[in-house]
Amino acid sequence: MRAKRWVIASPDTERVRVLSRETGYTPLTAAVLSARGIDTPQAAADYLSCDVRGLHDPFGLTDMDKAVEVIRDVIDRGEKMVVYGDYDVDGITATCTLVDYLRSKGAKCEYYIPNRLTDGYGLTRPAMEQLYEQGTRLLITVDSGITANEEIAVARELGMQVVITDHHECHENLPDAQAVVDCKRTDDTYPFSSLAGVGVAFKLICALEGDTLSMLDRYADLVALGTVADVMPIVGENRIIVAEGLKKLSVTANIGLEMLLREAGMKNRRLTSSTISYVLAPRINAAGRMGKAELAAELFLTKDPIRAQALAAELCEQNKLRQSEENKILEQTLTRLRREYNPLEDKIIVLAGEGWHQGVIGIVCSRLCDRYGCPVVLISVDEDGVGKGSGRSIGSFNLFEALTSCEDLFERYGGHALAAGLTVQADRIEELRTRLRKYAETHVTMAELVPQLHIDCMVQSEWLTQENIESLSVLEPYGMKNAEPVFCMKNMTVEEITPLSSDRHVRLSLIKDGKRFSAIWFGIGAGGLGFVEGNTVDAAFHLEINEFRGRRSVQLTICDVQLSDCEHLADQKILNLYNTLMQDGPLTAREARLLLPDRKDLVAVWRHVTCRAEDGRLSVPDGALSRRVAWESRRDINIGKLFVCLDVFQESGLISYHFKEGMLNILLKPYEGKADISGSVVLATLQSMAG
């Protein structure tokens, strides 16, 4: 995992003080608001408002009146209508919200959700023909359809009326439908353009019902679920919808949602937007990823508690299968990358595999992107030699533009700067890999691939009280464009490091101004840290109140930890001694002893390098390795002593090593028999200096 570049906001102290005084918010909350450019009482009131009166008139959306007229007419005539959805959480919740409402009004309404694995995204000609043959006379799309001009034309030619509801970007020429309702229409004057697909569907039922508040009361939980899962900005109408939806979620009348909460172990627990993102959405998405989106749709539409419980259990089982497929592909890719990936040269990873599950390669892309700190494209090749791929990017590398430079190789592709999809023939994948590598080499530096961590403000230890932390709840619900606040505190002393869950996570005890803070860092073990007990560090974190056995305490949830300036200064002093040694300069006996490793030090470094190397390679941030070895061996190994150990091994033909872009890169060399380091010049030189 590459280091992050911190971007720390510096809210104006006087503005924070005035905002706190005039609004009654704590200085901590006021500092977060000010850091985000919200530094007047009115701006704060507008930004934080969850007042349902802020919901706009649904008829403000272009063509909404036409959509309502067409749907009412079809209901009155008793003709069959079908809601055409999508297989992700947004599409499923949009489908279920609209179908449930229309059925409650007596509509003959069915739904159709394409199979991710066989149909792909969006409308298809075979689906249009099938639906017409089954008696469909009105097709209503949700979360799809805005660019399906050809498919809509087919539906119209067959004799179906079409109402499109979508939230994706529009092309210049809209489909020829009876109504096209999309908050991103260029000719739309609706005041909020960031609705989810389920948000647009919700607006449609509000228009049909003529009572927005009653529809919010009835469907806010499903609409919030789709809105958060689709990573929509939690501002404006979305903030109101999600705030109301989270209230409803804990007491939901939707039997399917209730059973899913139970199966996920979340019933009677505090529910937040994170609950949706990390607990509910993965289970619902798993159904779509595994080609069984209809399970999730049935779950949210059924009125039978026994059936709902069975479906919720099946969704959780599908999620386990998804995790299994994901981990299988991840292990395969990691094995190959240990052989093929060169961290010194490769700025993009492009891998293809036969039979990889198309529904999960996007998740694996994201995990590899985080692990290696570079863009990743994974391609699943089927038995017909057709590759379907997903890509994820990082930093400032625009993946869509990179793919556009290779567009002659694709059958189709699409996406945006940070995520994309593609279809390519297997015999063109090697050329694609070569061209993407060349593109990355000329369009991005390693420094530009470093991910940024945006920090709202630096805090003082006295600010971290339960009262102040609880006051931050006014900022909720969190999500896109209203992220959970990130704070940082500098020059904290690491008192204790405790591995958790077989060293998959770590708990830290940090000291600042005599105050002890408990911190937890998920997804990293003690052996992967770049610091040890006793080091001084800067920590970036979320703040929360931890409740355990009736006891409440302040807890820091770590986002990142970096060595403080004083540690870098200490390293530099040692490195100056090491550089003097390398330049044949004089060292005092005391200085030489600081650099001179004994046998146990050499063994500790060798053991760490050989155990951590993957296929003979180890790449770590240049200041981290000495501290990791020190942590594991409980020995005093500074950065200069580490380099001397590496020099000894290099002289003996055991390794080679060098630096690039802030990374220390070690390559193990094959050798036979017992390694002999007795002839090391650097070791002999230090021993003579040390006396």
Predicted segments with their positions:
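Conserved nucleotide-binding/hydrolysis micro-motifs of P-loop NTPases
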Residues: V89, L117, G145-I146, H168-C170, ...
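Histidine/acidic-residue-rich, glycine-tolerant segments that coordinate divalent metal ions
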Residues: V142-L195
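Catalytic domains of riboflavin
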Residues: M1-K4, E476
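Hydrophobic helix-and-loop "lid/oligomerization" segment in the mid-to-C-terminal part
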Residues: R2, A9-L138, L158-G159, E209-E431, ...
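Conserved acidic residues
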Residues: R137, Q178, D538
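Acidic, two-metal ion nucleic-acid-processing modules in DNA metabolism proteins
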Residues: L98, R103, R239-R336, D370, ...
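Short alpha-helices
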Residues: T97, P175-V228, K600-L602
